[in-house]
C-alpha cells in the first residue's frame, strides 16, 4: 500500500508538471497571434503618414500635426516647403533657459520638422527661423492622463545642469515619461512599456512592447522607435524580454530573455 501511495503521488506530480508546461506553451502559442497584430499597428502608421502632406504648405502656413503617430501626445510634426534649400532653426520655448530646446535642421527644400518637448494642456510657443524670417507657432496640446503619477518634490542645482530630459519607465503599471529639470512632463508614451528605456547609437529609443508573452513580466520583445512615436523595428523574442538590454559596439543587442520550453 505504501508503494501504491508513492506511485500515486509521483503520477500526480507528473500530471501537474505536464499541465504547467502545457499552460506555458499555450501562452507562447497565444502570443503568436498577438505578434501578428503588430502588422495592423504598422499599417496604422502608414495610414497616418497620408496626412503628412507638404504640397502648398509654406513657412507662413505650415502643416502642423500634433501627436502624428497617436502615441506620443507632447510631440508634433511641422511640414512645409521653401523655394531654395534652407536651414531651419527650431526653438521650443520653456519656462527658463534650462527647459528651452533649440535645434538647427540641415538645409533642404522639403522640411519635415519633428517637434519634441511640448508642455501638456498649453499653447506651446515654437519658433521657426529661416534666414532672416521668423515664424511663431502656437501648438495646443491635451492635458495629461488623470492617472499619471507626477513628481511631488523637485530639487535641482540648475547651475550644474543643462537642458536635458530625464526618462523614466515603470516596473509595473504607469507611463514612460520624460521630465525636464523643473520636473515638468515634456514627453510621454501612451503605449504601455516596461523596464529599460535607452537611446541607441542612431538616436532612436528602445522600449518594450506593450504585450505580455508570459507572466509575471515577460514582454514579447522590444520596439525601436523615434521620439515622435514611430515604430521603425520590432524585435520579437521566443523567450520574451525583461529588465535589461545593451547595445554592443557592433550594433547588435544583448537582451535579457528566457527559455519557456525548458520545462
Regions inferred by a protein language model and the residue ranges of each:
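Short beta-strand segments within Ig-like beta-sandwich modules, predominantly Fibronectin type-III
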Residues: 102-108
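Polar/charged alpha-helical tracts
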Residues: 2-6, 36, 40, 230
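Extracellular ectodomain segments of secreted/surface proteins
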Residues: 26-83, 150-155
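N-terminal Sec-pathway targeting helices
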Residues: 1-16
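Hydrophobic alpha-helical membrane-insertion segments, chiefly the h-region
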Residues: 15-27
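Histidine-/acidic-rich catalytic cores in large beta-rich domains
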Residues: 64-79, 84-92, 112, 116, ...
Amino acid at each position: 500500500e505504501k508503494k501504491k501511495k508513492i506511485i500515486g503521488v509521483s503520477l500526480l506530480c507528473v500530471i501537474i508538471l505536464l499541465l504547467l508546461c502545457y499552460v506555458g506553451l499555450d501562452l507562447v502559442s497565444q502570443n503568436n497571434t498577438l505578434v501578428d497584430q503588430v502588422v495592423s499597428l504598422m499599417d496604422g502608421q502608414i495610414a497616418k503618414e497620408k496626412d503628412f502632406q507638404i504640397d502648398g504648405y509654406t513657412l507662413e502656413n505650415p502643416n502642423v500635426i500634433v501627436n502624428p503617430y497617436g502615441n506620443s501626445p507632447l510631440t508634433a510634426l511641422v511640414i512645409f516647403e521653401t523655394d531654395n534649400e534652407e536651414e531651419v532653426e527650431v526653438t521650443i520655448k520653456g519656462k527658463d533657459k534650462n527647459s528651452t530646446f533649440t535645434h538647427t535642421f540641415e538645409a533642404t527644400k522639403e522640411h519635415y520638422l519633428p517637434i519634441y518637448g511640448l508642455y501638456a494642456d498649453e499653447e506651446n510657443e515654437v519658433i521657426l527661423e529661416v534666414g532672416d524670417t521668423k515664424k511663431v507657432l502656437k501648438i495646443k496640446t491635451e492635458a495629461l492622463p488623470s492617472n499619471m503619477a507626477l513628481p511631488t518634490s523637485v530639487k535641482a542645482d540648475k547651475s550644474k545642469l543643462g537642458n536635458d530630459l530625464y526618462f523614466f519607465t515603470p516596473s509595473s503599471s504607469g507611463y514612460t515619461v520624460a521630465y525636464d529639470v523643473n520636473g515638468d512632463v515634456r514627453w510621454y508614451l501612451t503605449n504601455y512599456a516596461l523596464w529599460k528605456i535607452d537611446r541607441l547609437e542612431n538616436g532612436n529609443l528602445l522600449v518594450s512592447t506593450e504585450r505580455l508573452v508570459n507572466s509575471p513580466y515577460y514582454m514579447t520583445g522590444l520596439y525601436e522607435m523615434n521620439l515622435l512615436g514611430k515604430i521603425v523595428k520590432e524585435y520579437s523574442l521566443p523567450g520574451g524580454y525583461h529588465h535589461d538590454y545593451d547595445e554592443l559596439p557592433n550594433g547588435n543587442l544583448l537582451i535579457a530573455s528566457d527559455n519557456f520550453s525548458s520545462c
